A protein has these predicted regions:
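Conserved phosphate/anionic-ligand binding catalytic regions in large, soluble enzymes, centered on
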Residues: 1, 144-167
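Glycine-rich nucleotide/cofactor/substrate-binding loop typically near the N-terminus or early
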Residues: 4-134, 194, 203-208, 213-214, ...
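A short linear hydrophobic-aromatic micro-motif
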Residues: 21-25, 304-311
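Short, ordered loop/turn segments at secondary-structure junctions
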Residues: 28, 176, 246, 310-313
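Divalent metal-coordination and catalytic microenvironments
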Residues: 38, 151, 226, 298
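Mobile "lid/hinge" segments at catalytic clefts and subdomain interfaces of large enzymes
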Residues: 168-270, 282
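Short glycine-/aliphatic-rich beta-strand segments at the starts of folded cytosolic domains
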Residues: 273-285
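Short amphipathic alpha-helix segments
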Residues: 288-307
């Protein structure tokens, strides 16, 4: 929505060497605002509860996931598709989980640009390190369970491809705004922010803002993406907005889940600035000859100016 080339994104997603997923890109309404919705559609073997509000915040487990999204903007990738816009990626492997090495192999199997591939691996590395710290295991032993890994793989590869395609020099993230309370996940009910998010924002110095509403607004995947791309927290003093993107979240909170990205341009100042260090001291009982010699040495070694002022006490 901020200006990344959709054809580039779809070409990358078609090349992912994993089956069992599709995507749908559409416009949706959030708080009466039109936002871009990027939806990863998983087949029955990969469906998860990540967007099921009753499961996430209710007292009873829910298995309602809703139907698949079938529109003209929907593209299914993998052997389970029967549409003209489907792409097959080989057999469907029934792994219970994927390690970081296997995920790296999946990323290497795409036709992403090298710069985008490096970014995708960086995001997953940040995520794996945060999970490893949370569970007290080495990074090599962290496994992303398949019920949640496939959509994360697609999300992260898509994010890396889009950010790389935009060709931005800096990414400024003043803060991530987080909710409060608890959320249900695979390991039980956890406080918000969840441990993986906590570890990421601690490690990378990301500021969290308090929304004051219950719910998990910052997910581990989102925090990892932010940590990987953020270069600054401070907006430039003056800038020109040249692009604007609004992305829709999937969870249904009281406060609409929206992510805004602004493309900014800055101009070089018409003036030049420099910094000068001024040194001052009091000198007692020193001859004029010594002071004169000291002045010569200071000027020879780069001092802009040297002067003496007599002091009477």
């Amino acid at each position: 929505d901020a200006g990344a080339d959709r054809e580039v994104l779809e070409t990358v997603l078609r090349s992912i060497p994993v089956s069992g997923f599709g995507i749908a890109i559409s416009r949706v309404q959030k708080a009466a605002l039109s936002a871009c919705d990027f939806k990863v559609i998983l087949d029955a073997a990969h469906e998860n509860h990540d967007h099921d509000m009753k499961y996430l915040y209710g007292k009873e487990e829910s298995h309602a996931h809703g139907g698949h999204f079938h529109s003209e903007e929907s593209h299914t990738y993998g052997e389970h598709s029967h549409s003209e816009e489907s792409y097959t990626h080989g057999e469907h492997h029934h792994h219970e989980h994927r390690g970081l090495t296997e995920i790296y192999s999946i990323i290497d199997g795409t036709n992403m640009l090298d710069s985008a591939r490096i970014l995708a691996k960086k995001i997953f590395r940040i995520l794996a390190e945060a999970e490893a710290k949370a569970h007290g295991v080495p990074v090599e032993e962290v496994h992303f369970h398949e019920v949640g890994a496939l959509d994360s793989i697609v999300d992260i590869i898509a994010a890396a491809a889009c950010v790389d395609n935009l060709g931005v020099d800096e990414v400024i993230i003043p803060a991530l705004w987080e909710g409060e309370g608890t959320v249900r996940c695979q390991h039980g009910i956890l406080p918000v922010p969840v441990p993986a998010v906590t570890n990421i924002v601690m490690e990378y110095g990301i500021l969290l803002g308090k929304i004051g509403e219950p719910g998990e607004y910052v997910t581990p995947t989102g925090a990892a993406i932010a940590a990987a791309i953020c270069t600054s927290r401070e907006l430039p003093e003056c800038y020109r907005i040249v692009g604007n993107g609004l992305g829709a979240g999937k969870r249904d909170y009281k406060r609409p889940g929206l992510l805004r990205a602004l493309l900014l341009e800055t101009e070089e100042p018409v003036y030049e600035s420099d910094s000068i260090l001024k040194l001052e001291c009091n000198i007692d009982d020193c001859t004029g000859e010594a002071l004169g010699y000291a002045m010569e040495l200071l000027l020879e070694n780069g001092a802009r100016d040297v002067h003496y002022i007599p002091v009477y006490m």
